[in-house]
Amino acid sequence: MTTNYIFVTGGVVSSLGKGIAAASLAAILEARGLKVTMMKLDPYINVDPGTMSPTQHGEVFVTEDGAETDLDLGHYERFIRTKMTKRNNFTAGRVYADVLRKERRGDYLGATIQVIPHITNAIKERVISGAEGHDIAIVEVGGTVGDIESLPFMEAIRQLAVELGRERAMFMHLTLVPYLGAAGELKTKPTQHSVKELLSIGIQPDILVCRSDRVIPANERKKIALFCNVQEKAVISMKDVDSIYKIPQLIKAQGTDDLVCQRFGITAPEADLSEWEQVIYEEANPTGDVVIGMVGKYIELPDAYKSVNEALKHAGLKNRLNVTIKYVDSQDVESKGTEILEGLDAILVPGGFGDRGVEGKILAAQYARENKVPYLGICLGMQVALIEYARNVANMEGAHSSEFSKDTKFPVVGLITEWIDSEGNVEERTEKSDLGGTMRLGSQLCHLAKGSKARELYGNATVEERHRHRYEVNNNLLPQLEKAGLKVSGLSADKKLVEIIEIPNHPWFVAAQFHPEFTSTPRDGHPLFEGFVKAAGESVRGELEK
């Protein structure tokens, strides 16, 4: 299969939405029957984002095969059906580490290792490898044109485009066209300078996607086309919209997919966007409102919980409910008390690391349990629910996780020292293991108990969900918890690790060790989130059995 490539770059400012624009184009091409994949090239020196602060980088998205990747891969999976893998995201740090490892082995036979050709060749090899087996690969380069960090990546895609030829490679560049209120007009000069910067490194864009807070009129598009050396029909106006799921239609309406197919000589049927039309309809026509309290420690940057945010919205679509997320700092719960949780229709405690704010999360779980508020715990959110139950129901005074308290008498959560990974290999860890890449990662099989809420929601005896954690329920103390009424409704493939817990005498209290948010999409939703938001809606209407 011959693969064609679309390289996506950004200019003027960061956070323009390259990932969303690229994923939207991919969604249209997929809707035309083409096999599409996406890649994200990150210029930072970290080997992967796994150990980066969520408040700086945003969430870490985990793929089926256990790669810790950029949050843009979450956008990719929410827009297209193709599942991402470790081949779909790599960093400058990963490339340099691989090249240096080869140099130490003597693979380069004594050559002087340089950015060109060794680093650029390594980048090209990874891009080609990740694109195999697809009609089109859309490759997004992180950062902004002109950044020194991204130069090796820009050079690599320039070389690759030359090697592939014009019939197999094209460039799409995102820029900002700001509106100056004082002058009362849109300004195209930043876009012109951005393209000039791109030209200086040998790249001529074929499509310009121009971000603005309003539709860019034809005369301004004509001006941009003239000064940036692109066809007028290839200047795409991408105005701000109230939902990212409207962007595929916005791009399709301007013929962007036709430009791609014409360039690559592809004959494909017209895109069927009926699924996206349904998503937009559901989003625009809710029948009620719910307020979900998200009690976390990284709330100053909502992108730290990007997939959770989106999964709640998806569940809202499926239930025809408008979901408002109220972010609650878990440290505020510690200092101000659970009064700040009053008025919430449901409570969600997401994953996290470290002991800062953990007692606030425990209090949130207690509040939800005692006041019969629907509760969904994810990863650490399950662990704090377990700790709270142990302390206040199972009479295990001072119960805690060994992550936060080494000398607790009841370590109901402890370090996993051995487990089977997604490929069936036995993994072992100790307290001295490196932090990066040493967690239980990727898709794992889970057995669901008969008669459980989890099994009712999923409708299956087994499911596969993605994990990212190094602490688990202590099986030695599990009998005492179960005797006190806790229900274990999900177990790992070998039935040795607890994956889901429930409280039977509560209207809706479910917590999972895995991350269900990573597999939720706007078209399909996710059973746990759908059930959770449904319970919140029933709570609002007074229909929830207390």
UniProtKB/Swiss-Prot annotation:
GO biological process: 'de novo' CTP biosynthetic process; pyrimidine nucleobase biosynthetic process
Catalytic site: 379, 515, 517
Residues reported to bind UTP: 14, 187-192, 223
Residues reported to bind ATP: 15-20, 72, 239-241
SUPFAM superfamilies attached to this UniProt entry: Class I glutamine amidotransferase-like (SSF52317), P-loop containing nucleoside triphosphate hydrolases (SSF52540)
UniProt organism field: Aliivibrio fischeri (strain MJ11) (Vibrio fischeri)
InterPro entries, A to Z: Class_I_gatase-like, CTP_synthase, CTP_synthase_N, GATASE, GATase1_CTP_Synthase, P-loop_NTPase
Function recorded in the entry: Catalyzes the ATP-dependent amination of UTP to CTP with either L-glutamine or ammonia as the source of nitrogen. Regulates intracellular CTP levels through interactions with the four ribonucleotide triphosphates.
Gene that encodes the chain: pyrG
Activity-regulation annotation: Allosterically activated by GTP, when glutamine is the substrate; GTP has no effect on the reaction when ammonia is the substrate. The allosteric effector GTP functions by stabilizing the protein conformation that binds the tetrahedral intermediate(s) formed during glutamine hydrolysis. Inhibited by the product CTP, via allosteric rather than competitive inhibition.
Catalytic activity: UTP + L-glutamine + ATP + H2O = CTP + L-glutamate + ADP + phosphate + 2 H(+); L-glutamine + H2O = L-glutamate + NH4(+); UTP + NH4(+) + ATP = CTP + ADP + phosphate + 2 H(+)
Taxonomy of the source species: Bacteria, Pseudomonadati, Pseudomonadota, Gammaproteobacteria, Vibrionales
Pathway: Pyrimidine metabolism; CTP biosynthesis via de novo pathway; CTP from UDP: step 2/2
Entry superkingdom: Bacteria
Binding of Mg(2+), residues: 72, 140
GO cellular component, one term: cytosol
Main enzyme class: ligase
Documented EC number(s): 6.3.4.2
Sorted UniProt keywords: ATP-binding, Glutamine amidotransferase, Ligase, Magnesium, Metal-binding, Nucleotide-binding, Pyrimidine biosynthesis
Similarity remark: Belongs to the CTP synthase family.
Protein name: CTP synthase
